[in-house]
Amino acid sequence: MPDLSWFDSYHPFQDHLDYLDDLTDAFNNSETFVSGTSLEGRDQKGIHFWGKHGKGKNKAILWHGTTHAREWISAMTVEYLAYQLIAGYGKDKLVTSFLDSYDFYLIPFVNPDGFVYTQTNDRLWRKNRQTPPANSTCYGVDLNRNWPHEWDTNPQGSSNDSCSQTYRGVSPASEPEMAGMAGFADKLAKSQGLKLFIDWHSYGQLLLTPYGFSCDTFPESNAEHLGLMAATAAGIASVHGTNYTVGPGCETLYPTNGASYDYAYDVSGAEWASLIELRDEGEFGFVLPPEQILPNCEEIWAGTKVMLSLV
C-alpha cells in the first residue's frame, strides 16, 4: 500500500496514473477504468472499488477533480479519499460499511490536457486545450460550462466569447472530456443508480448544492441537501478549524450554466449532488502550497465520512 508521503507534494500527470495502479495493486476489490478520452488523447483514468457484495452490485458514488486545470489540490483530494477508503476497509468499521454499501468511482483528472499544460506552460491555465474557433486566437473551453444541461440559459452563467475563462464551447458536450463524463455518469445511473455525485474544485471553501444555472430555482430536496452539507461542514471544521460556507451554487457563488452538479442531479438522477470548492479563501488561491495538501485532505476526509454516514 502506498504511504501518506504521496501527499507531501504535487506530482506530474504520469505519476498520478501510476499511483492509481499502485492503489489497485494494494486492494483486491478494485480496478482502474477510463471514463473518456481528452482532446489530445489522454485517458480520463479513474479507480473503482467495492465491498463484500461484489463489483457493480450497489449504487454508485462518483467523485471527480481537475475539471479546471489549475486546481491541483482537487486531484490530490480525490486520491486521498481513495487512499483512506481502501486503507480502512476491513480495519475500520465505518469505512468498511461505506464500501459494503456503495461502489466508488473516483476520477482525479477530468481535464488531463489542461493539467499537463499547467505543468509545462501556464500554471494558471483553466480550460481544456480546444483549438480556437474561426476568427479567434484563444484556446480552450471551460469544461464546467459544457455539460449538456441548461447549457446557455443564463448569459451571466457562461460566455460565448472563446477568449473568456467561462467560454461554454460551440454546443453542449462539444468537448470530448465532457461527452465522456456525461456518458459515464448516465451509464452508472442506468446500471447501478447514482447515489452521490461530487465535483471537486478550488478555491473558496464552499459546499455548493444545486442549482448553478438559476438563483430562483431549487430542487425538491433543497432543504435536505443544505442539511447534509451543513453537517459535512461541521465535520470539516472539527479537524483544523477550517470553515466552509454552505449554499445553493448560484446564490452562494455565481450563476453557472452547463454545470456538472446540475446535470448529475437533473439528468443523471443522482440522489445527492454537490460542487465543492476546497482551500483556501484567497491567500494562495489556486497555488495552494504543498504543506497544505495533507491538512486539506485530512479535514475533507472527516467531512466526507459525515456525509457518507448520512446519505
PLM regions and their residue ranges:
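M14 metallocarboxypeptidase catalytic domain recognition
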Residues: 1-311
